[in-house]
Amino acid sequence: MSFSLSRLVVALGAGLLACAAQAAEVQVAVAANFTAPMKDIASQFEKDTGHKVITSFGPTGGFYSQIQNGAPFEVFLAADDTTPEKLEKEGGTVAGSRFTYAVGKLVLWSAKPGYVDDQGAVLKKNAFKHLSIANPKTAPYGAAAVQVLAKLGLTEATKSKLVEGASIAQAHQFVATGNAELGFVALSQVYKDGKLTGGSGWNVPGDLYEPIRQDAVILTKGKDNPAAQALVDYLKGPKATEVIKAYGYGLQ
């Protein structure tokens, strides 16, 4: 091997080692409603940065308990703003890292085309057998659904028909599989690029429920992980925010 060729091999090897050293993994807990956009964002983030994202999807309340019990998550994308704030007050986050990455929207949805009208009158007709919602105690979208029913004066009328999913993902699954005729789900689960991906739905007016501000935060376990900070920065950037808007979320 010539001297110049050997130097080239050494240089290439050093470059590969440098890239490997800079690339890192980040463990991320993600609210179930943000599953589809996060998969898109994580894929693009990995291509753009070389970092690897290990995601877990589920209910925000469940993640809070896991984090309290020492789960290895480094970044938390919640379905509300109160849970990350609570962790922040408890000293479980990196100071100054919390921000609102999306503002969620609620939709009354059915897998059946034409079943839900664009004013939500199907709720007052009360001709359905099952109405799916996420557990309001652990899932912010479930809490929002309860608020809507209360504002419409339908709490008692629908009480016996409620089917609770452990998360907004399960609440959506109940409707998608026909186990419930309709349900309150996250708009992001049934919406892409300006239209519903199937079925029929009513975009619930924002004055019927408290704003669903969804905050992200770096947890203390991610304090020294460059991939954790890189992901949070990426979520604020143009590529991620375009994905977030495409799934029907608002931005703050």
Swiss-Prot record:
Matches recorded under Gene3D superfamilies: Periplasmic binding protein-like II
Residues of the signal peptide: 1-23
Biological process annotations from GO: molybdate ion transport
One Pfam family recorded for the sequence: SBP_bac_11
Subcellular location: Periplasm
Sorted UniProt keywords: Metal-binding, Molybdenum, Periplasm, Signal, Transport, Tungsten
Keyword Iron-sulfur among UniProt keywords: no
GO molecular function: metal ion binding; molybdate ion binding
Residues bound to molybdate: T60, I168
Cited function: Involved in the transport of molybdenum into the cell.
Assembly mode: The complex is composed of two ATP-binding proteins (ModC), two transmembrane proteins (ModB) and a solute-binding protein (ModA).
Family classification: Belongs to the bacterial solute-binding protein ModA family.
PANTHER family with a match to the protein in the record: MOLYBDATE-BINDING PERIPLASMIC PROTEIN, TUNGSTATE_MOLYBDATE_CHROMATE-BINDING PROTEIN MODA
Protein name: Molybdate-binding protein ModA
